[in-house]
Amino acid sequence: MKPKQLLSMLACAALAAGTLAGCGGDTQTTEERPTVRIFNRVNAEVQFDKNNEAVKALEDAVNVNLEIEAPPPSSYNDKLQITMASGDLPDIIYLFQTDNNFDTWAKNGLLLPLDDKIDQYPNLKDNISDEMWALTKAPSTGQISAVPKSNTTSHWGYVVNQKWLDALGMEPPTTLDEFYEFAKAVATQDPDGNGAADTFALSPSAQNTAGASVWGEYFLMSAFNLQQYANRSDVDGQYKPKEQFEGYYPYLTFLRQLYEEKLIDPEFFINKDGESSEKLLQNRVGMISGHDGAAKGLFGKASTEQVISDYCYYPPLADNDTGEVVQYIPPAMWGCWGIAANSKVADAALRLLDYGNSEEGWLLTNIGVQGVHYESYDPATKELIRTDVQSEKSRSEMSAYTPFSVTYHGEPAYISLCDTTEKLQKYNSELERYLSVTKEVSVPTVNSPKYIALNANNPDLFKKRDQMEIQYVTGEITLEELQDFIENEFLPKTAEADQETAELLRAATEQ
């Protein structure tokens, strides 16, 4: 579809939406339209006022009025809890996780079951996979209780300081041994040239219940046949929690070695989320773990000149035993949209979500209105051209959080944060290189009722595990102490939930 066709197609979609609403082909006046209330997390600079032209275009396309309440991501979960307990629910509610809260709200009748409604909305059926729909089934009821938000597939690897590689005369690491040599060189050969021993290979900054976590270093975990979530079998073909994977203790022991030898940031355990990216930009660390979205995020923060000369994105390390470069890919879903069970405009709310999953609605909610939010758009290359005024307009009226679907048939509308042709070309070429050497294997994601309840009812158990893993890496406890806790305290308490998860994964794999 050519960009110049977008507005005319939106006009046609508005007429079609009016027909679906039972208007006999005549659109309703704004006073007659149903009002759909939306509760969604959105960054604070986005303003949903009467002048928001992205919202106005969406209202006209679907023939509804929208009232949008949008707490910022930092406070969204607290506001969500208050809203769900208030008895006055918005019609559409963004839910980041299908966790114990989701299951409880569905069980208590707060969320509308959708099993008998999906067939009425062709775009929801077309754009959302069966695997994603399965993830929005509430375990307690067995009913689909939300509409999945389709997202881009994450290709995990690492971003490295290319200038440091050049200064050290090294190639990007592809194996664990090569990574270790790179880490030693970064720590001992002064790649930034400031004369101080203040550079490190890594500074992990993923977060869990204990604060900073070592379970975000996917590119490194791949060498040990690990990923954060054990939604695939181990080398013996058995489904098991990650604490029982053969690579679990060797991975943590390798990190302990790096820490003892001062090859990773000695203060990583106090990092905040995303702090590793800032340290890469500040020439304090040599690489960060992340998917291609992290690469785009870094590209967005750096100048075009820096992106071209300073940073490169590479695949994860090869498996130590097989030599393969493998990434395991679960269904790409970024939360979901619940419909209030007592909504008086549930059909209009579903019609809105259906439109957001059509090609026209997906483009509108992701890139906006041509001439207002962008100048031109090439769907083949995903190049999106905006003037400075249009860029500012887009930032104040739209966000990555606002689309009802990030992807259409698995593809994003554009490559976010690659805001110049040069950045986009570099990103595309590096992703192509990544895909040429990486074997990607689809794996299921399941919701175990027992595991959901276990997490909700035993937060201290998981926090203790997270803390002890960090304590082992930093040398505060021995391997024997960690093993004693995992094998004699943690795993016995998770055994029933682990067994149920394994059974669900086996069943999902056999489908």
Predicted regions and their residues:
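Conserved small-residue motifs centered on glycine
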Residues: 41, 355-471, 476
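Conserved N-terminal structural module of periplasmic/extracytoplasmic solute-binding proteins
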Residues: 8, 23-178, 228-231, 239-243, ...
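Loop/turn elements at helix/coil->beta-strand transitions in domains of secreted/extracellular proteins
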Residues: 33-36, 62-66, 87-91, 140-145, ...
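Bacterial N-terminal signal peptides that target proteins for export
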Residues: 1-10
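C-terminal motif of bacterial Sec signal peptides marking the signal peptidase cleavage site
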Residues: 18-22
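Ligand-binding "clamshell"
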Residues: 103-116, 143, 298-324
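Helix-loop-helix "hinge/cap" segment bordering the ligand-binding cleft or interdomain interface
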Residues: 115, 139-213, 230-275, 279, ...
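Short helices/loops that flank or line small-molecule/ion binding pockets
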Residues: 77-89, 181-186, 275-284
